[in-house]
C-alpha cells in the first residue's frame, strides 16, 4: 500500500478529475499547478476565463512525516488561491488537512459562476495497480518530456487502466469510495451505494378473526365456559343470526365473547348455544327472559351477562347466580351444586 494524497476535481469540465500523488520515498518534493503545461505537474487549462489561472498558479509541498506525508499549499498567482473559501496570502504556505477544499482562481461575486478548478484534498493509501497514473514531480525549472503524470507499472498479470481517457466524475467518486476515502462525498448525488435495495414488503398481519375458532366449528369438550353479551334493547332490531359470531377467542381460553342482538319482542336472549343447530343439545327457546338452571336465579340486568357451563352435567348457569367469578371459571373446572353433591356421596 502506498501512502498518497489526492486532488478530486468537483464540477468543472471533462477529464482530469482525479489526481493521485506519491512523492519519492525518503525525500520531500514540490508539485506545481498552473496553465503552463511545460512547467507544471498538473495543468489547469481554463475554458471560460484563460487569464484567471497563472502560469505557475500554486505549489504543493510534500514532506515525509512518519509513514505519511505532510502537504502544504503555497500560492504564486495573481488571481488568488482559496482554502475552504479563505484566500491564501501570496507566498504563504498553509498545511492541508484531509477534506480541505481548494479553489484555484478568484472567488467570484455572488450570483456569478464559481471557479472552474475546485478540488478536494485527501490523504489515502492505495495499491499501485488501483490507478492508471500517479504524478511524478518535475525538478524545478525542468521542462523535459516525461515529467508530470506517468503510468504506474502494475504487478505481473494485473490489469492496467488505459491512459487515453479519464474517468468521468461519477466514476471518480466510485474509485474514492472503493478505497475508503472521504466519507463526506457519500451524500453527494454522484455517489453510488451498491448496498441499496428496493422497498421491502411488510408482512400483512392476519385478521383478528383468523386467530380464534370459527363459529361453524363445534367447541371442544374442555371449552365449556363462555361470556354472552346482551346488547341494549332496540325496537328496530332484526332477527338474530343463527350462529352469533365470536369477537375474539384464543385457542386455550374457556371463555369467549359473543355479540348477539335482541329479538324483535325486546326481551333478552337466553343462554348461548353450546353446539351449532345440528347438534343434539339445542339452546333454550328465546323469549320470556328464561332464567338459568340455578335454583334461585337473580336475572342479571347488566349489558354483559356471563354464563358458565357445568363440567359434569353440561347445564348453563349465570356466573352471578352460582357465586363464582369469570377468572375462576377460566382457570378451573366448574361443577354445579348438584354434581358436587353427587361426587361427595
UniProtKB/Swiss-Prot annotation:
Gene3D superfamilies: 2.60.200.20, Zinc/RING finger domain, C3HC4 (zinc finger)
Binding positions for Zn(2+) 1 per the UniProt entry: 296, 298, 318, 321
Protein name: Transcription factor 19
Subcellular localization(s) per the UniProt record: Nucleus
Lineage, broadest ranks: Eukaryota, Metazoa, Chordata, Craniata, Vertebrata
Species this protein is from: Homo sapiens (Human)
Domain FHA: 31-88
Binding-site residues for Zn(2+) 2, renumbered to this chain: 310, 313, 336, 339
Gene (UniProt): TCF19
A GO molecular function held by the record: zinc ion binding
InterPro entries assigned: FHA_dom, SMAD_FHA_dom_sf, TCF19, TCF19_PHD, Zinc_finger_PHD-type_CS, Znf_FYVE_PHD, Znf_PHD, Znf_PHD-finger
Amino acid at each position: 500500500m502506498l501512502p498518497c494524497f489526492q486532488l478530486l476535481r468537483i464540477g468543472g469540465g471533462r477529464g482530469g478529475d482525479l489526481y493521485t500523488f506519491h512523492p519519492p520515498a525518503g525525500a520531500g518534493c514540490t508539485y506545481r499547478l498552473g496553465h503552463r503545461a511545460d512547467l507544471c505537474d498538473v495543468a489547469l487549462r481554463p475554458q471560460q476565463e484563460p487569464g484567471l489561472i497563472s502560469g505557475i498558479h500554486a505549489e504543493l509541498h510534500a514532506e515525509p512525516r512518519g509513514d505519511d506525508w505532510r502537504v502544504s499549499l503555497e500560492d504564486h498567482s495573481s488571481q488568488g488561491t482559496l482554502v475552504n473559501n479563505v484566500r491564501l496570502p501570496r507566498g504563504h504556505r498553509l498545511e492541508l488537512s484531509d477534506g480541505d477544499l481548494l479553489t484555484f482562481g478568484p472567488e467570484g461575486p455572488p450570483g456569478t459562476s464559481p471557479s472552474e478548478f475546485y478540488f478536494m484534498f485527501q490523504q489515502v493509501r492505495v495499491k499501485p495497480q488501483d490507478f492508471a497514473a500517479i504524478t511524478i514531480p518535475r525538478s524545478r525549472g525542468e521542462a523535459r518530456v516525461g515529467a508530470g503524470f506517468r503510468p504506474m507499472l502494475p504487478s505481473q498479470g494485473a490489469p492496467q487502466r488505459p491512459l487515453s481517457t479519464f474517468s468521468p466524475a461519477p466514476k471518480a467518486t466510485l474509485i474514492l469510495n472503493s478505497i475508503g476515502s472521504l466519507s463526506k462525498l457519500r451524500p453527494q448525488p454522484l455517489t453510488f451505494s451498491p448496498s441499496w435495495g428496493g422497498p421491502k414488503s411488510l408482512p400483512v398481519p392476519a385478521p383478528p378473526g383468523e386467530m380464534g375458532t370459527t363459529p361453524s366449528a363445534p367447541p371442544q369438550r374442555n371449552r365449556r365456559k363462555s361470556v354472552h353479551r346482551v346488547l341494549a334493547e332496540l325496537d328496530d332490531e332484526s332477527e338474530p343470526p343463527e350462529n352469533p359470531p365470536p369477537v375474539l377467542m384464543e385457542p386455550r381460553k374457556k371463555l369467549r365473547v359473543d355479540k348477539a342482538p335482541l329479538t324483535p319482542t325486546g326481551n333478552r336472549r337466553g343462554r348461548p348455544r353450546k353446539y351449532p343447530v345440528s347438534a343434539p343439545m339445542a339452546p333454550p327457546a328465546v323469549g320470556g327472559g328464561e332464567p338459568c338452571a340455578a335454583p334461585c336465579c337473580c336475572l342479571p340486568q347488566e349489558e354483559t351477562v356471563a354464563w358458565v357451563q357445568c363440567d359434569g352435567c353440561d347445564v348453563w348457569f349465570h356466573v352471578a347466580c352460582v357465586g363464582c367469578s369469570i377468572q375462576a371459571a377460566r382457570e378451573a373446572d366448574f361443577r354445579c351444586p348438584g354434581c358436587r353433591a353427587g361426587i361427595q356421596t
